[in-house]
């Protein structure tokens, strides 16, 4: 395995060298024309003719955007090319360490900051793996002036416990409007503890067409997620107090509750959004990138004309010399013959024709110069202008198709681990006794039709207005048992949803923006569901920098998922009717760039809160009598959140802090740490003016609380319901040190995570009974190519 890693690293380095040393590059101009250039930017000439001596700058423009999932609106976005905190982007615990996980990287996770948690999805089994998921509204679409490739790779450990992650993106345009590409992600974590390996793979293909009247976005994705479930270690003392145990274990020898238990989630997704715009044209100034692209195209056209003219001249010369047919050189005429005569009479004088009164008469050289200067000025302006289509009305259609399949598979189960057993074998008559093979499927097709009156087509239209109607069909499959049998079959269930809604928004300009959206369930299982969202921001100059004030509010009445009310497996089952969950949220944000300060305050009230719970008895050999399910709290729960982000700089010394305070009114149902802290202290400087270096350390800390445990049978974090076995975590700092580098289009880092392992209380748990990895050396590298 080490040889394979070395081979992969050498291959990547070789690819980089080849990219830098290649003699010929293919480039695409703004009109989609492909031409070649050498490494100096000169036009590539296979005949080695010196057709031009001017080095032309090749444009490397890449524009990125996301789209609204409902309407397909384009929203500008930034490519992930920032070197800062690159070393933290590889963790499933988040850039700021704000997520709990089950120890190993790439495992399930849950955000400790409640207001940042995403709402549950219809197929909630994949929610804890959201870091592997790129939803249509989060996917980056590209428009490129030249083919764009991005490759990232990070690694740690060896063939027994290591981790590997590779991410590859590619984008290319066929002309100005049509773009396409792919995005691949592969995660593989073997695990530093027993029975902890996991692997995830995602492949996405996209295509875009962004024309004046017609726009289209297509995204097709396939996912494979596999996680080995170990149920946690059998005794926390192996980590916190090893001296109390008669047997001493190394990290990879500590016994775990489960073995040969797996969660598999496969899914396929198609997203297609398109619209037809009705509007008019106007002239606007081009961006710097577009000006460079036009100049590049003009230089390419001029270069082509010169080559063709030179080729034509050489061809005529060869014809005149008779070289094409090896003919002798003919003697050409040398002047007028001696006997030449002038024929005819000399032409007579003609009458003057009347002047054209429609033409502008230039009386003097000064007037001529003035006209020429005015024309040159207008030509200069026209060279930087382009025609822009201004849409007034849009007709919108969006198709969203999703197909999920989940299997919980266990070859063995510990004695007395489960409290209940509801069937023996699966639908194929296998996995009887201690085996488990639970299967679940979900398929949905959603069509949305919208009509939009767009913002900004004239000075009076300060906001955009949209309306829509959507219809969704859903199909489910899950185990069910016939009376008198011990074998399950996959029962089928169907439901439909008809929703209507609208949106009023202002997104243009720099000072003031707002968005108001509402959606109502009319018929079907989502009848009565309501979502009202509002956000706004105000930006203005204060003491030489931008001050931003923002507010956000929403009211959501959400119906429970099908699997929240109906679920059957070999050892867990519930059949219940839940009320709609209601959430009311108000949030304010203050951000001032000059002092690098950001303050966020939020208040949220929840009613009929839906959550997962589990219970078991703790023994010396692990856990027994496990039960779990979906629960609902009918009372009101209030959550107060205050978060401060404050950065400081003194010369090359930088200090960043994120401090979050939370208070839940019902800690039994919604436990949250009172304080969550992330701090990052580092030196930032350049070597030889080209190599950017960040050298420092960061730490994550949160106060003790009864964090949710993990229920592997449904892949969810669940509240600890048994008072006798409840376990607190927290009060322990996680410290990393790193060196982060950025050289031109390459980022790379080397880091040591959890350098303080083995010190202090040794309570390095992010989930009860699931210890995190100890000290691990990691490295990563990221390249961007524009050819």
Regions of interest found by a model, annotated:
Residues 1-5:
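N-terminal secretory signal peptides that target proteins for export/translocation
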Residues 6-16:
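Sec-dependent N-terminal signal peptides
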Residues 18-22:
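Sec/Tat signal peptide C-region and signal peptidase I cleavage site
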Residues 23-271, 275-362, 541-546, 744, ...:
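Membrane-proximal, glycine/serine-rich, low-complexity loop/turn segments characteristic
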Residues 220, 254-312, 356, 365-787:
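Exposed, low-structure sequence patches enriched in small/polar residues
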């Amino acid at each position: 395995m080490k040889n394979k890693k070395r081979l992969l690293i050498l291959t990547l380095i070789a690819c980089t060298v080849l990219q830098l040393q290649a003699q010929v590059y293919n480039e695409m101009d703004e009109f989609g024309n492909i031409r070649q250039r050498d490494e100096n930017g000169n036009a590539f000439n296979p005949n080695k003719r010196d057709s031009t001596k001017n080095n032309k700058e090749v444009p490397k423009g890449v524009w990125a955007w996301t789209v609204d999932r409902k309407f397909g609106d384009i929203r500008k976005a930034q490519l992930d090319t920032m070197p800062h905190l690159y070393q933290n982007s590889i963790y499933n615990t988040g850039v700021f360490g704000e997520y709990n996980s089950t120890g190993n990287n790439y495992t399930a996770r849950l955000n400790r900051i409640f207001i940042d948690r995403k709402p549950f999805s219809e197929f909630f089994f994949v929610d804890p793996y959201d870091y592997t998921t790129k939803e249509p509204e989060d996917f980056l679409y590209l428009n490129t002036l030249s083919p764009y490739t991005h490759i990232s790779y990070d690694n740690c450990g060896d063939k027994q416990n290591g981790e590997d992650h590779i991410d590859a993106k590619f984008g290319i345009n066929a002309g100005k409007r049509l773009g396409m590409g792919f995005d691949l992600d592969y995660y593989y974590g073997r695990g530093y503890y027993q029975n902890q390996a996991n692997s995830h793979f995602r492949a996405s293909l996209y295509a875009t067409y962004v024309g004046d009247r017609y726009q289209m976005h297509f995204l097709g994705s396939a996912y494979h997620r596999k996680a080995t479930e170990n149920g946690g270690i059998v005794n926390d003392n192996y980590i916190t107090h090893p001296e109390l145990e008669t047997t001493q274990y190394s990290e990879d020898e500590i016994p775990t509750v489960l073995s040969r238990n797996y969660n598999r989630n496969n899914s396929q997704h198609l997203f297609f959004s398109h619209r037809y715009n009705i509007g008019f044209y106007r002239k606007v100034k081009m961006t710097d990138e577009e000006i460079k692209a036009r100049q590049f195209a003009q230089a390419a056209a001029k270069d082509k004309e010169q080559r063709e003219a030179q080729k034509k001249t050489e061809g005529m010369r060869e014809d005149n010399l008779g070289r094409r047919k090896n003919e002798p050189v003919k003697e050409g005429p040398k002047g007028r013959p001696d006997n030449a005569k002038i024929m005819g009479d000399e032409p007579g004088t003609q009458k003057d024709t009347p002047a054209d009164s429609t033409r502008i008469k230039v009386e003097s050289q000064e007037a001529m110069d003035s006209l020429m200067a005015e024309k040159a000025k207008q030509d200069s302006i026209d060279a930087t202008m382009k025609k822009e289509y201004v849409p007034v009305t849009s007709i919108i259609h969006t198709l969203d198709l999703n197909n999920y399949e989940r299997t919980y598979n266990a070859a063995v189960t510990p004695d007395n681990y489960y409290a209940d057993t509801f069937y023996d074998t699966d639908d194929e008559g296998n996995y009887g006794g201690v085996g488990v093979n639970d299967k679940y499927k979900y398929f949905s097709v959603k069509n949305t039709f919208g009509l939009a009156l767009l913002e900004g087509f004239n000075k009076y239209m300060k906001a955009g207005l949209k309306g829509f109607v959507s219809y969704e069909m859903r199909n489910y499959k899950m185990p069910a048992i016939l009376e008198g049998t011990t074998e399950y079959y996959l029962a089928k269930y169907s439901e439909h949803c008809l929703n209507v809604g609208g949106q009023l928004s202002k997104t243009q300009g720099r000072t003031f923006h707002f968005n108001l959206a509402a959606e109502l369930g009319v018929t079907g299982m989502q009848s009565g569901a309501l979502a009202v969202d509002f956000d706004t921001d105000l930006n203005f100059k204060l003491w030489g920098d931008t001050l931003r004030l923002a507010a956000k509010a929403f009211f959501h009445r959400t119906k429970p998922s099908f699997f929240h009310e109906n679920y059957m497996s070999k050892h867990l089952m519930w059949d219940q009717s839940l009320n709609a969950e209601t959430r009311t949220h108000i949030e304010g944000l203050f951000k001032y760039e000059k002092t690098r300060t950001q303050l966020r305050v939020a208040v949220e009230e929840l009613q009929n809160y839906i959550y997962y719970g589990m219970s078991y008895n703790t023994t010396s050999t692990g856990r027994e009598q496990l039960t779990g399910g979906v629960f609902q709290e009918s009372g009101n729960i209030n959550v107060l959140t205050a978060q401060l982000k404050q950065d400081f700089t003194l010369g090359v010394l930088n200090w960043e802090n994120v401090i979050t305070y939370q208070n839940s009114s019902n800690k039994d149902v919604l436990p949250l740490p009172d304080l969550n802290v992330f701090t990052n202290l580092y030196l930032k400087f350049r070597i030889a003016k080209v190599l950017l270096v960040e050298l420092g350390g960061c730490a994550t800390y949160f106060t003790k609380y009864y964090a949710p445990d993990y229920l592997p049978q449904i892949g969810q974090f669940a509240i600890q319901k048994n008072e006798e076995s409840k376990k607190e975590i927290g009060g322990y700092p996680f410290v990393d040190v790193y060196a982060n580098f950025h050289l031109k289009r390459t980022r790379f880092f080397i880091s040591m995570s959890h350098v303080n392992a083995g010190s202090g209380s040794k309570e390095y748990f992010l989930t009860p009974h699931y210890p995190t990895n100890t000290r691990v050396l990691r490295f990563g590298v990221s390249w961007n190519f524009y050819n």
